[in-house]
């Protein structure tokens, strides 16, 4: 009976599919097309991570494809253009709108400008021809500016073999100039180049926090043709806040105050901070040095004091909000983080992990020593208002929804494992387990459980104290979290304890065991990937090149690409981080130098700011059939062949 039902369902599916193809020839054409696509070289994947709100640096890397645009320009024009001309042309391709204005102002006559237009349009056509050489015409057409598809295709596929259409092509370009369409065409062609040199973008976590413009990064990603995201610990903090976690909300507000980025909250997302400021002004001192923002440049003394007060107010609220979760979730094993209960308020000291420390920079004005974890009525009202404002922000809703749609905790893709943080292990390299809802979870299963609960929390934003919402916060700070990757987060100690030994956050053994090739192979196998061919691509931890640390570990099985976009870490890493390119020939790690500014590029030309290093070279050039996309296409082919056999062969 079941077999008959399955057959009936399959027949109905084939009936529906057959409606797309009116004839046998149409069906055959589609199969031929798909089979041919499988033989094309795989597209270039671009991996970035830890963007941390640094929109302009991210934009630059995106526009130049981690040096891929410059590489294509060099390939074509290195023998015909000077270094300066290549720099100028590269800058035009990266920032066409702004560079065009500068170039146009440099010409003294219209005829000179028109000559430049002709030369530049022809160069861009030549560059697109080269950059699109591994794509079908259909795919290229989708990348072209819609208003100029016909004109560009005529120029791309022109042939003067019989010398019949020379004046036709000449007239095309001359008319573009005469009708003042040159600027729009050049801008469109430049963006086409940017999209062609990278087929797919992977963001390996941490779009948010520290930097000033994560919202602009999100808008860019929403408009990007092909992208996926592996959530970072800072990303789940924002997801958690929107999903109803007040403790996640308190954490992200504290971080914004710490890095003087409260403008993100108020101006970018329209969230009203006035209730929090009123509370802070009422209870806290603006001189507390531990709560001064890390970057006070450009702030007035009044602004500095206001941020310092807000910083204290939200930090104390955060510590209070953590306690109820720790108490109702014993499987989180976080009792030592009941920090407000560890304080002897008379002696002004705290006992943590069996050791007693004197406290400094204290701001315990709203804490009742007899019930230190209880929010005051005023604090409770402030958090209610803030959460309501967060969940009513349309822009934040759009950004968080996109994060959920495009994001996962980890991603197996084209034989590689993409993961922001870690896979929790013990010192012997065995997967660490955690009990979630009476189920013992470890390895891939643990990460799957985490992700399921994140999605559940997001789907039930009105519930604030369920296991799902608590687990989103745990991903930010818990010892078995794949995103945090440390035994404890010592935020309290960093504010109030002078002894720096108390600040130490012990990393999960994963971070030194990932140097071991056998360990990495074991992890790849656990995630269903080929341990001989695959790689683990990791973000989260800045690579300290300045100290000789190598981002390529475990004989090339582990590649760490913390982007180093965060200016706060560039002094400790020595560079502006790494990105990764993976094309049909293999993988290249790109080390980036500090990005000055867009203005510097526009005025001085786009000089090379990156150094490439081969990670892995394919013995055989990779085709689309070897990729995830190829698997999807093959499944379509199999179904279409079944339809052909069912409808036309029998």
Swiss-Prot record:
What keywords sit in the KW lines?
Answer: Carbohydrate metabolism, Hydrolase, Manganese
- For the keyword Membrane, the answer is no
The record's GO molecular-function terms, alphabetically, read:
fructose 1,6-bisphosphate 1-phosphatase activity
> Which Enzyme Commission number(s) are on file for it?
3.1.3.11
Cofactor(s) this protein requires:
Mn(2+)
**Pathway(s):** Carbohydrate biosynthesis; gluconeogenesis
Family annotation (InterPro entries): FBPtase_class3, Metallo-depent_PP-like
GO BP terms, alphabetized: gluconeogenesis
Q: What class of enzyme is it?
A: hydrolase
Disulfide bonds listed in the record: none
Reactions accelerated catalytically: beta-D-fructose 1,6-bisphosphate + H2O = beta-D-fructose 6-phosphate + phosphate
Family per similarity comment: Belongs to the FBPase class 3 family.
UniProt cross-references to HAMAP family, sorted A to Z: FBPase_class3
Q: What is this protein called?
A: Fructose-1,6-bisphosphatase class 3
Q: Which organism does this sequence originate in?
A: Staphylococcus saprophyticus subsp. saprophyticus (strain ATCC 15305 / DSM 20229 / NCIMB 8711 / NCTC 7292 / S-41)
